[in-house]
C-alpha cells in the first residue's frame, strides 16, 4: 500500500474546524487531504501541523457530521497547489481557486505550490520604474514603484474598497499597458462587498485584465489563509513565465490576521501581542516578500496590501508588523473622509521609501520630487494654521497665513479630492502647480527657479474637483 492510498482512521478528537489525527506523523505539513465521514461524504482539508504523535488538519468545510469512530483521512497532494494558466485573466475564483463565474475550470498549464519559490536575494533587481495609479496623492507624493510592496492603512467604515477598485481600474506602467495585469484577492467579504467588487470590475472593464480571488466571511478560516497565496502564485506565474507586470491588491489583511489568530486559538498556541500568534511577523513576511523584480526576467510583481487598523490604531500589531516588512504606507484619513473628500488619503503620514528610485527626469518629470516636497511643506503649514485659528481666530493671521489656509482647502478639494478621475502624472502635476500658484513665489522655497519660470501661474480649473459615480 502506497502513501497515496493510505487512510488514517485514528481521529483523536475534533475541536471546531480542526481534526487531530493520531499516528499520522508521515503526513507532510501543508498537505491537502480528503476527510471521509461514515456516509462516504468527502470534505477537503489541509495539514497545518505535524508532530511525532499526531497531525492537525484544518477542514475546509464544517465539521458537523464527522464522527471519531468513522472519520478517515487520506492524502490528496503533498502540498497545496494551484493549477495556473494565462487563461485565468478575466476570470473570478473563490479563495481556493475554484471558478465562481459560471465558466468551466481553467485548463492548467502548470500546477504550482501556493507557497511559492523563495526569491534569491542576489537575483533581485532594483525597483525603479514608476507605476501610475491615476490617483494624484499616490502618484505625486507616495509614488508606487514596480516591484515595491506599499500597503494602504485604512480604518473601519472608510472607503478602502472603493479605493482598491479605483487602483485596480486605473493602474498602469506607462509604455507597458499591453502586458500589465491585476491580481485582486479579497478576504472576509460580506455578500454586499462581493457584489460591489464583481459589479465594479465588470462595469468598468477592469475584469478584462484582472484575476479575482474572492473569499467570503462565511468561508472557513483556513481558506482565508490560502487566498493571498493563491493570488501571489498566479501573479508569479504571469510575471515570471509570461512577462506580465502584475499589480497584486490584497484586501483586507486584517481579516487574514484574525483568521490566523482563530486557528492559533483552536490549536491552543501560546498567544502573542493582543492574542495574535507570535509567528505572525514571519507569516506576513512570507506574503509581502513575494513582491519584486528579478534580474533577467521581463515581468514583475508589485503589491498593494490593504488593511483596516482596529480602532484606527497604527501601533496595532497588524499595521505595526506590516510597516516593518513593507516599503512605506498610504494612510486613509477619517477626518478627510468626514469632509466628503475622496479618496481621503492623507499625504502627511504617508510615505513611499522607494519613490526616489522611480521619479524625476526621464521617468516622470524633472520637477516631480520638488513639487511633492513643496506640497507636503505647504499643506503641513496650512494644517498648523488651522489649529491656531481654532484657538485665537483669524485676526492674528498675516496675509501670507491666510493664503496658506486657502491653499490647504484647495489642496484637499482639488488635489486630494479628485473623485473618480483618472489623472496622468502630468495632469496631477498640473493640478499641483495650479494650487501652488496661489502662493507667493517667495514661499516656494523647495522649487527651482527654472520650474517656477516654466509652470508658475498655471490656472486652476473647477473640473479638477472630482465627483464620485454612484455604483
UniProtKB/Swiss-Prot annotation:
Q: Which InterPro entries match?
A: ATP-synt_VA_C, ATPase_a/bsu_AS, ATPase_F1/V1/A1_a/bsu_N, ATPase_F1/V1/A1_a/bsu_nucl-bd, P-loop_NTPase, V-ATPase_su_B/beta
Entry keywords, A to Z: ATP synthesis, Hydrogen ion transport, Ion transport, Transport
Organism domain of life: Bacteria
Single GO term (MF):
ATP binding
The reply to whether Transport figures as a keyword in the UniProt entry is yes
UniProt-listed CDD domains: ATP-synt_V_A-type_beta_C (cd18112), ATP-synt_V_A-type_beta_N (cd18118), V_A-ATPase_B (cd01135)
Q: Which GO terms describe its biological process?
A: proton motive force-driven plasma membrane ATP synthesis
What's one Pfam family here? ATP-synt_VA_C
Q: Which family does it belong to?
A: Belongs to the ATPase alpha/beta chains family.
Q: What does this protein do?
A: Produces ATP from ADP in the presence of a proton gradient across the membrane. The V-type beta chain is a regulatory subunit.
What name goes with this protein? V-type ATP synthase beta chain
Q: Which organism is it from?
A: Deinococcus radiodurans (strain ATCC 13939 / DSM 20539 / JCM 16871 / CCUG 27074 / LMG 4051 / NBRC 15346 / NCIMB 9279 / VKM B-1422 / R1)
